[in-house]
């Protein structure tokens, strides 16, 4: 699906408290140190318009379909305005969350929602999928303890262990469904640097 770009598209996925944002940043800093053309972005967000949509999505309680469509609209703006242009210039794009997060966070709230998310992406979005996705696999019990230490939170952070388990199981399911693309990094008992080194081995 990536025949319209020259660069490489890397995404990081995982539940709240998994450390995926930290690993996204660490990989970005590493590639920059190697003089590799690279940008770091995130979803929901990444552009002025999408960041405004993010504020609604992560703080307001929306109807499930409204939340899904909000996420998809933000992604379209992000892809067209930012991701695809820099990929065409040969950059590596690192994105903290992408389509798989939408499947798990929004898709699970709808009947046949996971398949719906991927079908909507295929139908509505430009023909682009990640070249590689890193699923940072951290057990929910560990993840929720990390989140409880944060000073800031959104509506997803403060949901209980049942929600964390559901999201975790969803990412595990997706890693089994798309094994060629999604690389699972078992990170519960590893340091940040150890996780980073494992990620580098897949590049």
UniProtKB/Swiss-Prot annotation:
Which InterPro entries did the record assign? P-loop_NTPase, Thymidylate_kin-like_dom, Thymidylate_kin_CS, Thymidylate_kinase
What is the source species? Rickettsia canadensis (strain McKiel)
Q: Which residues form a coiled coil?
A: none
Protein task: Phosphorylation of dTMP to form dTDP in both de novo and salvage pathways of dTTP synthesis.
- Which cellular component, as a GO term, is one annotated location? cytosol
What lineage does the source organism belong to?
Bacteria, Pseudomonadati, Pseudomonadota, Alphaproteobacteria, Rickettsiales
Q: What is this protein called?
A: Thymidylate kinase
What keywords does the record list, in alphabetical order? ATP-binding, Kinase, Nucleotide biosynthesis, Nucleotide-binding, Transferase
Q: Where does ATP bind?
A: 14-21
> Which Cys residues form disulphide pairs?
none
Q: Which NCBIfam families match?
A: DTMP_kinase
Q: Which GO terms describe its biological process?
A: dTDP biosynthetic process; dTTP biosynthetic process; dUDP biosynthetic process
GO MF entries: ATP binding; dTMP kinase activity
